[in-house]
Regions:
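Soluble catalytic domains of enzymes that build or remodel membrane lipids, polysaccharides, and related
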Residues: 148-224
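Short, glycine/acidic-rich beta->alpha junctions
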Residues: 50, 107-109, 218
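Generic structural hydrophobic/aromatic packing signal, biased to beta-strands
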Residues: 3, 31, 48, 58, ...
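Transmembrane alpha-helices and immediately adjacent membrane-cytoplasm interface residues
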Residues: 8-44
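Activation targets extended, charge/polar-rich intrinsically disordered C-terminal tails
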Residues: 1-9, 194-287
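Short amphipathic alpha-helical segments with coiled-coil-like heptad repeat character
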Residues: 58, 70-78, 223-227
Length: 287
């Protein structure tokens, strides 16, 4: 869209030497492109990459929840994997709390958060809000502003969504924090996730890097009342949560707290152990 508009402007300025006339035609071209852009509709019916080929959906019956299309891929490398989609059931009366992962891949200002809910002693289900890419697509921060990617809520086993980032993707560093959310707050947030998951399965949405992304959605679903610039520059969102008193810190200063939250080595040591979730939490503040 932006490149097409740029070409149109250059062509217009070359073709029309009259300044007023050129500006008017540029504005007309801009309005035309904008109106066309606003007609673009998101869809669930595209040639999706295998790891986002299915959309999760949930059935809720009192305290009993069944989630379909839980992703639990068998990875050999980042790009070589066997997709697996499972159905899992949860008892809402057993929800204990929620944790949050932050993964960095370059800039300290940008991260990808994943929220994980704990049921019972060692049962976790992770929620990752992402771009839903078609076959052949790669992520572009610029395209993320322009109705290019659909939004997807990936519901996953931690051995999938976490281990993919710690064990298989190159140059990614992940950190794990336990929140102080009560079981009641965790339950309400979990149900908000499920309602949104069911809604976008029937009414798909565009991802937007500014207004409809991984972090803005988490803040809305968790009922965060305060706006903070670190919701957008989310590489600093862990410090925001620390300062608000939302994390179990063990009374550590932030730098030390974050250092001990780094889980890559523990995740690699755990591999595909069924006890993966316990092992990456063991010995860390708040767990």
């Amino acid at each position: 869209v932006s490149s097409g508009y740029g070409i149109a402007m250059v062509g217009t300025l070359l073709a029309f030497r009259g300044r007023g006339k050129g500006i008017a035609i540029c504005l007309a071209a801009f309005v035309f492109v904008l109106l066309w852009w606003l007609t673009l509709k998101p869809s669930n019916d595209r040639d999706w990459q295998p790891d986002v080929a299915q959309t999760a959906w949930a059935e809720i019956d009192g305290d009993h929840v069944t989630i379909h299309n839980v992703r639990n891929c068998d990875y050999r490398t980042e790009g070589d994997y066997t997709p697996r989609w499972e159905t899992r059931s949860f008892d809402l009366s057993q929800i204990r709390g929620m944790d949050i992962f932050f993964t960095y891949w370059g800039s300290p200002w940008i991260a990808h958060p994943v929220v994980s809910f704990q049921f019972g002693d060692h049962d976790y289900i992770a929620m990752s809000i992402e771009t839903r890419k078609e076959v052949g697509e790669v992520y572009s921060a610029v395209r993320g502003f322009f109705r290019y990617y659909e939004l997807i809520y990936t519901v996953s086993d931690e051995r999938d969504v976490v281990r993919l980032r710690t064990n298989y993707r190159k140059g990614e560093e992940s950190y794990l924090f336990h929140t102080l959310a009560t079981p009641e707050h965790a339950r309400a947030t979990f149900l908000n996730y499920l309602k949104k998951i069911n809604r976008i399965r029937n009414r798909p949405e565009w991802y937007n890097a500014l207004t409809n992304n991984c972090t803005t959605n988490i803040a809305a679903l968790a009922g965060e009342p305060q706006w903070d610039w670190r919701v957008l520059l989310n590489g600093r969102a862990d410090q925001m949560l620390y300062e608000r008193g939302d994390l179990a810190t063990g009374n550590l200063p932030f730098a030390q707290f974050k250092e001990q939250a780094h889980i890559n080595a523990a995740a690699r040591a755990a591999g595909d152990d069924p006890d993966f979730s316990r092992r990456i939490r063991e010995g860390r503040a708040g767990f």
